[in-house]
């Protein structure tokens, strides 16, 4: 028995959702798609492939994934994004673990995500690779445990859970396909940076002008060299600039929100200000013309 539920959040992913669902539907009991009111064929395609689709207005990345997670009937859940695909090797590995009833040796499993550049049919040598927890028992961990963030959507263990030695890195890989176009990447950068800026305000983050001035340069170098976007050639150079601009935007928007909050005068504050100002004038008048 499989006893795995897969959940995916979507928004206008008609070009990629089929690939994601097809890579998990044979190793899971159910596929839950929580869609943020897509205007394309995402919902139709997902339903055609047998997924259970729930249309849900946007709750933020963490909120949307937490809701999708709560809709899963099984304790063991697998989360992938619409732009991801499990390799056949990874599918076989997960299936073996669960058919042999060895899944409970660990509380969670990490997956290696290999970035595939748009249009590529196979991974490039030295392509960027990330590790993240995507297969886990939701009795012990959840996206809902994320604190003070709507954008950093990561699986967090319950406070009373000792997960030392209880996370296993799977050998198989999953493919993460980069944006469908420059326009899509820019739109995502604009939306995501706005969400991040709101989070930073809630967290009380402070910003220096030096940080704002150097953020884009540092983040470009980080993406192009440390994250190895250089393996994608000039296209990687362009994507590194977009990544750096997105990181700059979140700080610029944070500064903008902070300045606006400092200049806000509520009705109560305005009344109190007027009363204080009136009292000050009366005090000055008394000091200037003391009673005889």
Curated annotation (Swiss-Prot):
Superkingdom field: Bacteria
Disulfide feature: none
Classification via CDD domains: Beta4Glucosyltransferase
EC number: 2.4.-.-
A single MF term (Gene Ontology): glycosyltransferase activity
UniProt keyword annotations, A-Z: Glycosyltransferase, Transferase
Class of this enzyme: transferase
Pfam families referenced in this protein's UniProt entry, alphabetically: Glycos_transf_2
Keyword Transferase in record: yes
Family: Belongs to the glycosyltransferase 2 family. WaaE/KdtX subfamily.
PANTHER family in the cross-refs: GLYCOSYLTRANSFERASE, POLY-BETA-1,6-N-ACETYL-D-GLUCOSAMINE SYNTHASE
The protein's name: Uncharacterized glycosyltransferase RP128
């Amino acid at each position: 028995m499989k006893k795995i539920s897969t959940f995916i959040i979507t928004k206008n992913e008609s070009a990629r959702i089929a690939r994601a669902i097809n890579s998990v539907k044979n190793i899971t009991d159910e596929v839950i798609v929580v869609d943020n009111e897509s205007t394309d064929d995402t919902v139709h395609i997902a339903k055609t492939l047998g997924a259970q689709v729930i249309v849900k207005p946007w709750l933020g990345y963490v909120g949307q994934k937490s809701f999708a997670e709560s809709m899963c009937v099984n304790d063991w859940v697998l989360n992938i994004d619409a732009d991801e695909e499990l390799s056949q090797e990874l599918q076989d590995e997960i299936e073996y673990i669960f058919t042999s009833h060895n899944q409970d040796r660990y509380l969670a499993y990490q997956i290696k995500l290999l970035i595939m550049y748009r249009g590529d049919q196979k991974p490039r040598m030295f392509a960027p690779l990330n590790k993240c927890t995507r297969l886990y028992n939701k009795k012990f961990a959840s996206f809902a445990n994320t604190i003070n963030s709507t954008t950093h959507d990561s699986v967090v263990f319950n406070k009373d859970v000792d997960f030392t030695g209880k996370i296993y890195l799977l050998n198989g890989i999953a493919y993460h396909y980069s944006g469908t176009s420059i326009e899509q990447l820019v739109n995502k950068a604009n939306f995501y940076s706005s969400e991040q800026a709101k989070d930073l305000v809630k967290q009380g983050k402070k910003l220096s002008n030096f940080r704002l001035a150097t953020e884009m340069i540092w983040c470009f170098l980080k993406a192009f060299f440390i994250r190895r976007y250089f393996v994608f050639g000039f296209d990687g150079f362009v994507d590194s600039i977009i990544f750096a601009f997105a990181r700059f935007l979140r700080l610029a928007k944070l500064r903008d929100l902070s300045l606006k909050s400092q200049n806000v005068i509520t009705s109560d504050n305005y009344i109190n200000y007027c009363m204080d100002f009136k009292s000050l004038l009366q005090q000055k008048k008394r000091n200037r013309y003391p009673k005889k």
